[in-house]
């Protein structure tokens, strides 16, 4: 029987399924091997619908059940074309098909029918996928729920806090970030055991002192720079003024006051005689 079309009538035959075939194995070679054990009614090798390549298994049908059992016992584990065959009796019978589809070529089932194998495997393959999808969706939902519970009920009682450290479990105010450190390391929980003066409080105090020292040093540097600039400006102004005064003194001759000239003229007169003095007194 050729492998391209189904047999005309397979009712009442015993079907053996032969697995682990090579692509080179033909229906004629299988018929020659299995005819040693009895009358063979049909040999069928399913092929892929698109590529027409063999699918790696075949169905061999016997008219007598004893012949089928003898062939199964002898050929199960035998080698053919370099492959070890696996032979077993098909468990499922042929499925009744409508009259309009009886002439169409279909894949055989394990029990001698054409078309039940592909449908049954399709149904079996679909159900695990659906289960797998439902299982994969389950953990994601549970994760999202667990995350929402973790964020909502346990930590975030205040609506504005985003980080879990600044929430109601660690700090009472929703906006303070530094209070987490104070409440955790220098609060009432650690004050009895002496953690308030530990390295954490020292670290934060040294950090605040360094910040304040840097700010004061920057301010003093800025004030010293401004005072030095003012001093340089005042010194330059005083120098310019002294230079202008010295230049004006060198250009203009010294002025003599009128009082000094009158006193000089009076002192230059000759002394009066005693006669003139007597006249002046009379």
UniProtKB/Swiss-Prot annotation:
Pfam families: RRM_1. Strongly expressed in pancreas, spleen and prostate. Weakly expressed in lung, liver and thymus. One of its GO terms (molecular function) is RNA binding. InterPro entries: Nucleotide-bd_a/b_plait_sf, RBD_domain_sf, RBM, RRM_dom. SMART domains: RRM. GO terms for biological process: mRNA processing; regulation of alternative mRNA splicing, via spliceosome; RNA splicing. Residues 91-282 are annotated as: Disordered. Belongs to the splicing factor SR family. This is Serine/arginine-rich splicing factor 8. The lineage of its organism: Eukaryota, Metazoa, Chordata, Craniata, Vertebrata.
